Amino acid sequence: MWPDDLYRIMCRGNYIEILSAITNYNLHKHGANQCENESIPFTAIHQALQLRQIDIVKELIQQNPKLIYVTDHRRNSTLHTICITPNVMDIVISLTVDCDIILDIKYASIILNKHKLGEACIHVLKEGISGNEISYNKINKSIEYMKLIKERIQQDELLIAEMLLKKGIDVNAKDVYCRTPIHYAAERGNTKMVNLLLSYGADVNIITLDDLSVLEYAVDSKNIDTIKAIIDNRSNINKNDLSLLKAIRNTDLETSLLLYDSGFSVNSIDVYKNTPLHYAVQAPSLSRLVPKLLERGIDVNAKNIKGETPLYLMAKNGYDTENIRTLIMRGADVNAADSLYITPLHQASTLDRYKDTVITLLELGANVNARDYCDKTPIHYAAVRNNVVIINTLLDYGADIEALSQKIGTVLHFALYGTNPYMSVKTLIDRGANVNSKNKYLSTPLHYACKKNCKPEVIKMLLDNGADVNAINIRNQYPLLIALEYHGIVNILLHYGAELRDSRVLHKSLNSNMFSFRYIIAHICIQDFIRHDIRSEVNPLREIIQSDDTFKSIWLSCKEELKDISKIRINMFYSLDIFVISKNMNLLHHLVNNPIIKEINTYYFYNYGDRLKTSISLASNRHKILEKSRSKLDEILDSSGWSKLPPDIKLSILEFIGNTELRKICNR
């Protein structure tokens, strides 16, 4: 019989069957082969203890009193085993039972641990191995019953533990990890077991191989009664351990206050060089603890392994401006940077809801133009997250709107990297950002907008505000060449005067996006259509098109469609082709309300439909802005000579003004 065979019988057998199996169990033959990493003990006494088979334990000890001194492969004494709650999932997997049973036990243990009923998992394990139903729903509906099971198991554990202690078991015996039974009892938050072990002389100052004390294990249990028991029963407890730090790290306010009032050190440091204050400032629920830690003289400028100070972490979490003021008044360096030269203000600038934190830091001396390791200032952090509120706040306090970072560029470049750049880009432009600023690669914001496939309204906003549609960067790339994957942007760029500088636009668009490819050829066809009477000029791209059958077939299709468009008369002076070839919005807005234009279905034109649609939309938008501006000026200048001018003269005057400036008039 192997250890796992005996274990199965321990789970499902009756008293007689279990004792009979133990009698036939040959420890010397099979125990030596037991893998040390397995969760199943190889001794009968430890198996019985692990499964809380109390009657079996008593019988075995009665037959052989020396069994209480037997240890398992991890040097766990019998007292260790009764104090440890076994990991039922490791056990059930080791037993290689049916997958359905494994899943049932897994879900049941999740529910029980959620309700802090870990001890009841032992009952579930035995039920599952015995073949009894332990479904998720059954366990979920039996929480009260499981609480009774837990109480019964804990009572049995106390009886066995006291019996072992009375028979002389070493209360401070250490396992391979140098843990004593009270370490495990404290970790479980088993207050009654802790009190029992303390009454028999358990040493709470024994440190394990991972440098943890009994109290630190108890702190992780978050059981305040267990923690009080350890503190109250041992006057010689070491108060310089990490107990207070761990309680704060666990955001356990009750335990933190108890340990603080008990005099535990506030200057402890963990392996990451964090102090209790580092953790306290990150949890809103612990805000009342911050002034208490400061009263004890904790180092307010202590840096962890990343170079972060408590103020830095508080700014990063963006809450409690009162405690931010308190920290700074107590000497916290408002500009203390981490190992990457990121300051508290950089961190606070990441979210709109941190506005109060940003203002507090700025009012108390934060450098609004501090630079990190990539030369990014706080406004770069706000821009890349499209935080308009923070952008405006930083600008109000003197942030450099043209600050240039090493890699990406200016604030406007960063804004285009965000997920929703429209409002932040608009804000920056309205506040004077240069739309043609260049980074070290000579790329403009328009280059980035094309690369990031920004929405059409963002592209148009840049172009309407003077972005150079033909700017070339250090890699000899212009916006149109970068945007060829995105035909919607290509259409806009061509409409705003993008030049077809070389054959790359043809070959790259053919490989990237067929719609872009058609737009390019259609645009060349328009140029040829406009210049048909200029014999001296030869378009080199046209020669390339004529030399390739694929290119040529699309060219001919565009040419025929353009002829069809030119046959549609708008009035006696203009045909529909004016909306294809002209970029003069002051001309087109006079034509856009023509009934023929309103009836045009742009989807009918395969090659020029999108171009027509864009042109009509821009003309319509121009007309609306002009009319709205005229009405607004009529209100403002009601008593002046302006009101006496004919409407068409007013429009003619306003046509000299761009859309951006007209919008400012409309918004007055």
Curated annotation (Swiss-Prot):
Matches recorded under InterPro entries: Ankyrin_rpt, Ankyrin_rpt-contain_sf, PRANC_domain
Coiled-coil residue spans: none
Taxonomic lineage: Viruses, Varidnaviria, Bamfordvirae, Nucleocytoviricota, Pokkesviricetes
One Pfam family recorded for the sequence: Ank
Protein name, per record: Putative ankyrin repeat protein FPV244
Start and stop residues of the ANK repeats: 40-69, 144-173, 177-206, 210-239, 272-302, 306-336, 340-370, 374-403, 407-437, 441-471, 473-502, 571-602
Transmembrane segments: none
Keywords, sorted A to Z: ANK repeat, Repeat
Cited PROSITE patterns: ANK_REP_REGION, ANK_REPEAT
